[in-house]
């Protein structure tokens, strides 16, 4: 066991794969976020160690939007000894000259754009009335959607009251390491990183990771329905979002074509690598759009990119 302190209260059989694929059932905090600053890594880890999962580990997929930071971050720390921010800086940022940081230095605070964001715990799910519709009148996808609306897993995962005091524009948030949610950097650096990964994981003789590892990490290891994201058929590799089957006309989801891997952010930002075309792409923004059009801008850019490639 890499992390024996975690194995209690129904989490004893959690696997590393469960943590990497959003199947640990720990997509939120049972008793809200620890009331401390974001830099108090141990407080968040301890809260997750002690609590029960919302769903049995391995039984279902539920997007661990923020808790992924400490669940996978602590696992990395236990194995390697470094925090995610330290690891990324030493293994990726410095060697590749990337302007991307997990745990921002105070001297760089003036370079950050102000972020406009919306409270998500007050969000009413689309078609909220579906919870009153008898299941025999619904198809399988709508039944999955109904179950997620009733379970309120979305609210458990995205409860953001803690952001009222220390939101995305606070010094506390920007300088802390919350590696699933608060990376700070440029679109160019993200596109560069994914471009290198999409071209053999090597640049100027500098090998980042073994190609076999990336191949394994970017194949589908978990499929929806995702209990947090309203039953969506989201595919995950190890940490990465990978090729999706959503229509490119639906702007509440990002476009991820075959042989692409990357991730999307709740504000509408997207970064991915394309193994087929050997390119990296990134779009970052500082304003959160309406849920129905969350990825509209990025999707328009993605479509334009592939029109050029095709």
Protein language model regions, located:
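Active-site Gly/Thr loop motif
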Residues: 118-187, 219-276
